[in-house]
Amino acid sequence: MSITSMEDLKNKQAEVKKNLDGYTCRVLVCSGTGCIASGAQKIYEEMSRLCEGIEGVAVEMQKDVPHVGIVKTGCQGLCELGPLMRIEPYDYQYVHVQVDDCREIVEKTVICGLPVERLFYRHNDEACPHPSDIPFLNQQTRIVLENCGKIDAESIDEYISVGGFSAMAKAFFEMTPQGVIDEISKSGLRGRGGAGFPAGKKWSQVARQPEKVRYVVCNGDEGDPGAFMDGSVMEGDPYKMIEGMVIAAYAVGAEDGYIYVRAEYPLSVQRLRMAIEQAESYGLLGDNILGSGINFHLHINRGAGAFVCGEGSALTASIEGNRGMPRVKPPRTVEQGLWGKPTVLNNVETYANVPKIILQGADWFHTIGTEGSPGTKTFSLTGSIENTGLIEVPMGTSLRHIIY
């Protein structure tokens, strides 16, 4: 199916929502790298096997036969407690799930709607049935990670069902390229890769270059030891980052983009490839996107494990097939980046913020974080601390609050 207009996108969203509403129960199995390493794939397979035969079990228990969906999601955040599972519509959060627990989950929760209480997270010896009951989760503000752990990480339909690509459509049909840049500039969004350079200023510098060929590049080479924020976004909601890149390309007049992913992220590469293929099949990437006349082609480039390739000029050199070596600046990438052309280079988290800003507006973004740096920041917590995992908190949150 090709989506060739804003109306088509709205119709597709309604269709997918209707299909999802038809499920009486959805089992969300965390399938981020951490949970997969803990055995989540076997749990997914066992739940799928048991739910295939659920009709016989339900009849035996004299219960109505539920319509069940088994879903692979991205990271659900509580990485030290994996494998993790959420059950909709009850919003139960299970931790330390094992294959031997699956039958009980099906019989009690999937069929009867009852909790398996021993699988709940416990805080100060009190059970926390729902994510909203867990202090580690309920104190977060999620923009970048809002879909991670909630939608199928391998389904573009589920991304569309939660408003996916609506921001892109709004940018194309309701805003000029300069209007997009102005909104990003007004939002105060800063690059989330470390330097904190204003994203709108960078886009504006590329847009005003006389050279007509321009590129949009995403830095997914997350090389800091123990960091897995960008990897979790690429694994859990690759579509949001892709949508942000398309909006950036529209704003600066680019028709080609590259995602540079570190070699140690094979699952990210796999899901990004799936996401790109699905978007192309729907007409949401490629030529004449949404019937707008706008073209944007997206490519994946795998790094070779060199830490230095996280630096912008080294990264672009690596994409070009050269040795990844930083160069003296100026010129900067906004002037002469990939193949000597003006290039927007932001990281995964920066692009993932863009769709929400376009939809909700710069003023909304300013209500979160600090005056000088609005919005949120994702962090991966590792080491000898109380909670390890993935979080997203407003800018200005103290390290003491995050760690302890």
Residue map of PLM features:
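Conserved short loop/turn motifs at secondary-structure junctions
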Residues: 31-36, 90-91, 256-269, 273, ...
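Short amphipathic, charge-patterned alpha-helical segments
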Residues: 50-51, 244-248, 394-404
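Hydrophobic alpha-helical positions that pack around
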Residues: 140, 269-395
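Accessory "access/gating" subregions that flank catalytic or transport cores
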Residues: 169-210, 367, 392
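Histidine-anchored nucleotide/phosphate-binding helix
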Residues: 237-251
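Iron-sulfur (Fe-S) cluster-binding modules
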Residues: 1-29, 37-72, 88-186, 254-259, ...
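Conserved phosphate/anionic-ligand binding catalytic regions in large, soluble enzymes, centered on
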Residues: 31-39, 80, 184-206, 305-317, ...
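Gly-rich Lys/Arg/Thr-decorated short loops/hinges at beta-loop-alpha junctions or inter-strand turns
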Residues: 151-166, 218-230, 333-338, 380-385
